[in-house]
Curated annotation (Swiss-Prot):
Enzyme kind, highest EC tier: oxidoreductase
EC id: 1.1.1.37
Function text: Catalyzes the reversible oxidation of malate to oxaloacetate.
Keyword Oxidoreductase: yes
Official protein name in the record: Malate dehydrogenase
Annotated positions binding substrate: R95, R101, N134, R165
Taxonomic superkingdom: Bacteria
Reaction(s) catalysed (UniProt annotation): (S)-malate + NAD(+) = oxaloacetate + NADH + H(+)
Source organism of this protein record: Bordetella pertussis (strain Tohama I / ATCC BAA-589 / NCTC 13251)
Keyword tags: NAD, Oxidoreductase, Tricarboxylic acid cycle
Family: Belongs to the LDH/MDH superfamily. MDH type 2 family.
Amino acid sequence: MSKPALRVAVTGAAGQIGYALLFRIASGEMLGKDQPVILQLLEIPDEKAQKALKGVIMELEDCAFPLLHEVTAHSDPRTAFKDADVALLVGARPRGPGMERKDLLSVNAQIFTAQGRALNDVASRNVKVLVVGNPANTNAYIAMKSAPDLPAKNFTAMLRLDHNRALSQLSAKSGKRVADIEKLIVWGNHSPTMYPDFRFATVGGQGLTQLINDDAWNRDTFIPTVGKRGAAIIEARGLSSAASAANAAIDHVRDWVLGSNGKWVTMGIPSDGSYGIPEGIIYGFPVVTENGEYKMIKDLEIDAFSRERLDFTLKELLEERDGVKDLLK
């Protein structure tokens, strides 16, 4: 007997990331090859965006995905999020020319306040929310604060792209396969201040620091390369990373729903006060996932360099939080 379909809401559905994401969700890559889905797609009310969304839906229909039971187009989050089991908040206002970061925060605060309220009112009480649109951590924080009737743990931000980027760099440096590297962490904000940390990472049971014992490379090459990878892709491609971002979103939700099989993964989650990170801040932490729940890896040793990096990325998150505080009243 087939499973009941899960409702997946996606915002910014006609955008670059949306286009790279939707077909993979509909094929079963995110929720399982035996899990039917209903896609509820949100775009801004603008006529051009809605027309583009219609075109994407035509293509989804033309794929004749066996698992895609229904797809609907929306311009109002209150209909798009109705009974949603999973919500991927991809759409966000990008930073325009001459736009200060505080302006970006303010515009996105309005978007994510409205979306948080809509989730609060109409989504499933167990909805799993992943914020992809930047600034992802703070946008997730805004949505969470705007949805007081939903558990805070339902709101997450995407650091999986940074995690995957870091894995790729470590693989290239060590000569080991990406799939064999375990226990990597990316701490903090999804921004260049993040801290990719391979002090606990292993390859086939061996500590990765034994293979890469190079503090200068870690500090001067690895950390900045991971932090600035998005900018490097824009420089090379003329467009921001869309396929890799969509891939990371699928990884994040797949592991959250289906489990990470004991492997550590990075998720931006509300802090419980661990590692000196104030409670409620959405921060990248190492987690394992099973049975639809994530569990933070606790009590890892934080050396002096790591403490400095954790505090550096926290400072940025606190500044962002303070920048939107007045908008959350």
